[in-house]
Amino acid sequence: MKNIYCIRHGTAEHNVLFKEVGEKAYMMLRDSNLTNVGQIESAQMGKYWIEKNNIELVLVSPLTRTLQTATNIFKDVNVTMLALDELKEYPASYENINHRKDRKELVLKYHPTVNFKQLAETDKLWDTENHETIEQLDARVKNMKDFILKRKETNIAIVSHNTFLAYFLYGEIVDYDNELKHCFPYKLRLKSNTTYANK
């Protein structure tokens, strides 16, 4: 049994732009930063979330907004942070907002706080021609759950994205009216790769 805490990144630049231009925002920006609000959200979670001190492993998407969120939340905690492409937002391909930076650039900025040993130098999930399918997302989520179940740690935090985490938690994609909250710990007691939480 694993106790998984799923945390959506803080408010990012594309979240704000989306309110102005809709889905065009996802092509207008590449790998956006947290806004000032997002920086505050993640810092506040790090300050007030008591459970963070019991976390044995942090798994984080290698996109900038999630790396910023994770390092803000856990800056005062001695815990391993491991970046994994499998935690990128859906679709992991096509939309510029989900195109991560090269590994060497990430290492320069975040190492040794974050471990990037699992990443290829370039974003292997990135594809300018093809949109990731729901079936591919489903496989990504199940592979991630299998990876977690093989780990020795019991209490694990995942810092990722709205659509990926909703599918990880509930096995479905949520609409814009039911998005996950920014910087809120959704808990899942993971028993198998088909375990889902109740809403």
Regions found by a protein language model. Give the residues of each.
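Phosphate-handling substructures
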Residues: 13-17, 21-33, 77-139
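Glycine-rich phosphate-binding loop signature in dinucleotide/nucleotide-binding domains
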Residues: 51-54, 148-154
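Conserved histidine-centered catalytic loops in small-molecule metabolism enzymes
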Residues: 52-86, 107-121, 189-199
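A short, acidic, amphipathic alpha-helical segment used as a generic capping/interface helix at domain edges
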Residues: 137-151
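Domain-level recognition of soluble alpha/beta enzyme cores
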Residues: 172-198
